[in-house]
């Protein structure tokens, strides 16, 4: 085997631990901006508050007790799957038309399920509801554990690609000349890849805003999509767009998929890697994420490796 071939087990190990890298990048480079995990407070289907998971500031909102005399409170992570945040104190205070408090407040705790049904409220009475977030390391561990099936599935696909395709190609490449030059080009590629990733994360929030008002921003999206791809995007229904927005707001999931693409590239033999050197840019990665996020594959079956090879 060519000694310059990648240590495939190290690549797979790095990918398995990609969420540790996510934490490091979030803290070191973006100070909690593009890579901040967020928590969601919901009251029924009408009210939704989103704040950084690191925030301990109480979140307040006003909602009406239903005609059935109940209110459903939910505390969860902003994710493509439901991951509850339990043990969250809440306070409900009935308020008058002028916003002044009426009577004694109700103090309750959202349990481990992340859902609390309040049945003691007065029908059609407005309440000020205050959530007191206390997100712990155990909560974050539970969030990360929810992604393990995604990571395992993608690692399996990477191993298949390595065994069936890349490993034989590396063996064929072992007798090629200019290995030292190849290694130097590989360093240049890595630098370009890092710059592309920085560009990608810098534009995540912009992508979210563009999709949130798709028709008004259609011309701006042409910076990332072809006209044909944009036409297909404009045909999507509101549910598909909403799912795409949720995917783009699920930063750990996005990071997992980008990490899978990076791992796939790390396994490539030099000839294939150099071919990509001039093609991998922040815009290319953004294009991939846009196509993936809005194609209805923002779940455990989504496969950025297939998307990239097809792209």
PLM feature spans:
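Cationic, glycine-rich low-complexity segments
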Residues: 1-266, 302-309
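Hydrophobic, membrane-inserting alpha-helical segments
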Residues: 271-311
């Amino acid at each position: 085997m060519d000694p310059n071939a990648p240590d495939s087990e190290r690549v797979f190990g790095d990918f398995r631990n990609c969420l540790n890298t996510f934490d490091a990048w979030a803290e070191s480079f973006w100070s909690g901006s593009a890579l901040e995990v967020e928590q969601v407070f919901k009251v029924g289907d009408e009210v939704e508050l989103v704040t950084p998971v690191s925030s301990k500031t109480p979140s307040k909102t006003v909602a009406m007790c239903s005609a059935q005399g109940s209110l459903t409170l939910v505390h969860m992570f902003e994710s493509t799957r439901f991951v509850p945040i339990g043990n969250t104190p809440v306070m409900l205070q009935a308020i008058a038309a002028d916003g002044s408090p009426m009577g004694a407040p109700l103090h309750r705790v959202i349990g481990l399920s992340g859902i609390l049904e309040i049945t003691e409220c007065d029908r059609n009475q407005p309440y000020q509801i205050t959530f007191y977030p206390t997100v712990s390391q155990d909560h974050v561990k539970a969030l990360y554990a929810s992604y393990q099936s995604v990571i395992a599935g993608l690692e399996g696909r990477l191993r298949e690609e390595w065994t069936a395709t890349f490993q034989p190609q590396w063996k064929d490449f072992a007798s090629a000349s200019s290995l030292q030059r190849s290694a130097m080009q590989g360093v240049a590629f890595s630098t370009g890849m890092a710059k592309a990733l920085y560009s990608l994360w810098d534009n995540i929030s912009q992508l979210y805003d563009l999709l949130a008002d798709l028709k008004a921003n259609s011309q701006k999206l042409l910076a990332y999509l072809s006209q044909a791809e944009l036409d297909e995007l404009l045909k999507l229904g509101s549910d598909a767009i909403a799912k795409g927005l949720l995917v783009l707001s699920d930063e750990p999931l996005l990071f997992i998929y980008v990490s899978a693409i990076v791992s796939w590239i790390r396994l490539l033999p030099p000839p294939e890697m150099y071919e990509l050197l001039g093609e991998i840019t922040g815009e290319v990665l953004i294009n991939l994420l846009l196509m993936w996020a809005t194609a209805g594959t923002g779940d455990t079956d989504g496969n950025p490796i297939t998307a990239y090879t097809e792209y």
